[in-house]
Amino acid sequence: MAKLSLAEQISQLANPKPKDVDIENFEDRDDGSESGGDVDYDSDLATEHYVKVGKSKLRDDAPALNPKYKAGKVSRKALYDDEDEDGDGADGFIDEDDEDDEEDDEEGEGNGFIDDEVEVDEEDQDEDGDEDMEDEQDEDESDEELSENENDSSARATLKELLREEKKASKQQAKEAIVSDAQKGFAIHKQTDLYETLLDARITFQKAVQSANALPISDTKAEELGEDITNTLQDTKAKLSDFISQIAKMRHNMAVQDNVFAADSVKLSTKRTFDATLDNMDKLDTEFKAYETSVLSKWSQKVQASSAASALNSSKFKALNQSSANQVAATLADMDRLVKRTRMNRSNVVILGEEQMGAIQDAEGENYYIFDDSDFYRNLLKDLIDRRMVDSGSQSSGVKTWTATKAKTKKNVDTRASKGRKLRYHVQDKVQNFAAPRPVFTWEDDQIDELFAGLLGQRVNFNEDDDGEEKEKEEKEEKEEQELVIPDDGLRIFG
């Protein structure tokens, strides 16, 4: 650009050109005027009561692209090797041209002498040697690149195979865990059903146990009741004996099936006497003792390990922190007390043939012909009721949760917003730079009324007592005026 003269510089200062502004470039626009700042300030004031919200989470920052469009990773060594190959190729091309030019010059300068021919042959040999060296280097580099590519591809294939195997193993482990949890849940559900079935049977037998306490003590008493009753009692005894024998056989078969003991190790008696029945039960209880203790200890330890109750409770001597086997052993240690509690006639049952129960019970109220386990029966009923209440509560809470979830998932759609059936409105911005008046003076209402009455040139009496006196005076004057009126003497001129 040519240098401006003094006259041109003066003319530019006298008549400056306006600044060229790109109206489409919103980022670099800067008017430099103070009004722009005021407008921005006013707009901020108009929207300062709006709720500040963050960026919407409906769209991600980066677009969702297919993984095949992602760029591949290249090592730095491979990048520099490619550049070196390009440079070597260019240098070799230039060198060959230069050599050809030199050969042409030498041929033009030479006169066909032998010395010139010898020099040309030597140069050709040197060129052939250089080309062979370059070819060998190129082959070595290409071999190295191929080996590196093969190593990279093999490493990638190995890594993919390892990842595939790891993913497969994790899926298999998750599947096995799900199957194991399902089997455990099914086993627990089955055990719960079996326990409830036994509990229902025990509740059903309670009436039979209570009725058995009213049976006669001796055969002579039964004979006195009559032949029909005697036959009924004999049939009942036979059925009970068969029932106890079946229970003993069932316990024996279940123990053999679960490998608790061998089938030949315990032989049950086939006699139906009372002593034989007790002997069979004692044998089974003795064989089951070790198995029951091991099973109770095993599952008690698992339950305590899964729950943090044992870790939180520092005292290990509490009953809750001990194993189930120890708790059962501690409860059965005082067997005399437990047996004595079952010989109390709490239901006031009267034995058939006896008029009173006092004759066959001792001073402490213990009756050897009574079996009453009402305490244990009440505990069973309490556990059953608590379990049923918990189940019903969990079901009701599940229904409530499902209802709440359904209510949340329901779309909030206004059915009246279509076809112009709803008033559409826009929230107006609040008034700017406005402050409502706030009373800061301490005048009372009487003082304010007196002030404004004085300004208007009137006098107002704010004393209520004076008003009452004036009213009394007015009433007295009205009464006096009424007394001065001429009384009615009964004379009427018109009709």
Swiss-Prot record:
**Protein localization:** Nucleus, Nucleolus
Could you list this entry's UniProt keywords, alphabetically sorted. Nucleus
Query: What GO biological process terms are annotated to this protein in UniProt?
Result: maturation of SSU-rRNA from tricistronic rRNA transcript (SSU-rRNA, 5.8S rRNA, LSU-rRNA)
The UniProt annotation puts the region (Disordered) at: 10-155, 462-495
Q: Which domain of life is it from?
A: Eukaryota
Q: Member of which family?
A: Belongs to the AATF family.
Q: What PANTHER family does this protein's entry cite? A: AATF PROTEIN APOPTOSIS ANTAGONIZING TRANSCRIPTION FACTOR, PROTEIN AATF
Provide the protein name: Protein BFR2
Give the organism, scientific name.
Yarrowia lipolytica (strain CLIB 122 / E 150)
